[in-house]
């Protein structure tokens, strides 16, 4: 399978050629998050990965502390729980940066179906026949569904995930990574309505 060598080549190359930028991001982002409310820099979720394996994910916090106690699990448009800096992180998807650690560990790939919180995955498996089929591939930071999906309907996401699983190849991954990079540069990752909030299955440090 090409996935593991593909991920390691890209990850290693990025850290070599973009080291100054990555060092800046890893320094500035935590400082801004902490200085805004002296709260935690990361939040942690347990998600469901390939073949149902559970793993721990860290992301930069984009919502106020204890967001799960202040509103619904699902993020709404113009959600007041999202901080001002959190909006920037979400638009650029830089809140996902800590998940590169999961790529190093082999739990996540650059491209693949989005890993869902355990409870969300279990609930959707109960209501949508065949939803567990998306677990046949390693989850990804970005993917076919994340790039092309214009709706939050789980059945549509499943259709896109299965389409990727059945056709995945290095050239498709490169294409999806390129589109994702453009979205990050232009700040187009801002459609989070109806998706799981930062507080879903949150585990406090």
What are these regions (language model features)?
Residues 1-65, 176-205:
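A hydrophobic, helix-centered structural microdomain
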Residues 2, 6-9, 57, 78-82, ...:
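Alpha-helical membrane-protein architecture signal
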Residues 32-33, 73, 131-135, 162:
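Short, P/G- and charge-enriched loop/turn segments at secondary-structure junctions
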Residues 43-44, 111-113, 119, 156-157, ...:
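Short, hydrophobic secondary-structure boundary micro-motifs
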Residues 43-81, 141-159:
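Short, glycine-rich, amphipathic interfacial segments at transmembrane boundaries or analogous
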Residues 75-138, 177-180, 184:
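A short, structured surface patch at a secondary-structure boundary
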Residues 133-205:
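C-terminal terminal-structure detector
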């Amino acid at each position: 399978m090409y996935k593991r060598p593909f991920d390691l080549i890209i990850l290693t190359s990025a850290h070599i050629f973009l080291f100054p930028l990555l060092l800046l991001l890893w320094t500035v982002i935590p400082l801004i998050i902490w200085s805004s409310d002296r709260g935690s820099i990361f939040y942690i979720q347990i998600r469901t990965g390939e073949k149902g394996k559970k793993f721990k994910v860290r992301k930069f916090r984009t919502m106020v502390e204890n967001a799960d106690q202040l509103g619904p699990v699902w993020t709404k448009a113009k959600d007041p729980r999202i901080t001002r800096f959190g909006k920037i992180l979400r638009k650029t998807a830089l809140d996902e940066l800590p998940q590169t650690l999961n790529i190093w560990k082999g739990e996540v790939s650059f491209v693949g179906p989005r890993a869902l919180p355990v409870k969300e995955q279990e609930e959707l498996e109960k209501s949508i026949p065949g939803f567990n089929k998306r677990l046949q591939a390693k989850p990804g930071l970005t993917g076919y569904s994340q790039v092309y999906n214009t709706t939050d309907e789980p059945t549509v996401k499943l259709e896109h995930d299965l389409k990727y699983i059945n056709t995945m190849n290095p050239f498709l991954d490169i294409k999806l990574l390129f589109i994702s990079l453009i979205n990050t540069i232009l700040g187009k990752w801002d459609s989070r309505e109806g998706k799981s909030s930062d507080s879903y299955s949150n585990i406090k440090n």
